[in-house]
Amino acid sequence: MKKVIMALGVLAFANALMATDVKALAKSCAACHGVKFEKKALGKSKIVNMMSEAEIEKDLMDFKSGANKNPIMSAQAKKLSDEDIKALAKYIPTLK
């Protein structure tokens, strides 16, 4: 029984370490998009906090894959894991 409890504790700790730090990711976007994603980046982009979770996730995945042609955003999105993208897409709409 002690081994099972120990194993569950180790798994829970490992999972917590691997969790996406979405606030840290969002800070790296703030220079262009604003702290609450309320700005048009470089005066051109959509206002991201006005988008739905699904729209944000799709756009970031498309930037990552190259389907959306924007060299700056493609370079940024390629640094993100799919988990990071999902976490950002869920987090950003809460900043309104």
Swiss-Prot record:
Record-linked Gene3D superfamilies: Cytochrome c-like domain
Superkingdom of origin organism: Bacteria
PROSITE patterns (UniProt xref): CYTC
Any one cellular-component term (Gene Ontology): periplasmic space
InterPro entries noted in UniProt: Cyt_c-like_dom, Cyt_c-like_dom_sf, Cyt_C_IC, Cytochrome_c_Oxidase_Subunit
PTM note: Binds 1 heme c group covalently per subunit.
Keyword Transmembrane helix: no
Annotated S-S bridges: none
Predominant place of localization: periplasm
Keyword match Calcium: no
GO terms for MF: electron transfer activity; heme binding; iron ion binding
Keyword set, alphabetical order: Electron transport, Heme, Iron, Metal-binding, Periplasm, Signal, Transport
Subcellular location: Periplasm
Family label: Belongs to the cytochrome c family.
Role this protein plays: Natural electron acceptor for a formate dehydrogenase.
Name listed for the protein in its UniProt record: Cytochrome c-553
Organism: Helicobacter pylori (strain ATCC 700392 / 26695)
Organism classification: Bacteria, Pseudomonadati, Campylobacterota, Epsilonproteobacteria, Campylobacterales
